[in-house]
Amino acid sequence: AVPIRNDFPLDKASLLGCAVMTGYGGAIYAGKIKPADRVFVIGCGAVGLSAIQGARLAGASVIIAVAINDKKLKLAKSMGATHNINDLNHNPAEVTKELTFGRGADCVIEAAGQNVSIQQSLEASRPGARVVILGKTPFGEKINFPFNLMMGEREIVRTSYGMSRPRIDFPKLADLYMTQKLILDPMISMRLKLENINHGFDELEKGNVARSLVIFD
């Protein structure tokens, strides 16, 4: 157990344990984002949205959000993304190169957990970039991409919790929320009772929610 401030709302606290901590840590610790960095985040679920906020809090100058759901992209914009790309309509790597004057992103955060999104992450990165893989593909699935995408001194990092330190970072994230620097309220897309849990899973599978809360009366 990690103690947090007493005035921190418990419904918001329930978000910290996995998605928010992973995305924030992926940007701050694993991604090592610095002021003025250009950042590419693919996947705008709760993990990706938290990574976008981590990039904003780190001082990134360009934050490119990529998803296939326009509602999620709108949410990403409200959390700090400076540019949105719907990759059903555009090639994310090509648009990123245009937005970064041909360079590519300094830091890339993959939060979609798909074979194609991992390849797109590498394609969008500049030589010497740090590519952080937060998403998880189905267990046992093989990842295939051209070897040349690993060239150019790119550093590829795989982390499940963003290299976060719960005893330090839980209280820090609570403070960031209470001082209105971390946005959590819009991440709660739905509140439902336990007997409606299957509806929550259906909406999650459709990509309609960032996070659902199960309320026990």
Regions found by a protein language model. Name each.
Residues 48-49:
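N-terminal Rossmann-fold NAD(P) dinucleotide-binding loop
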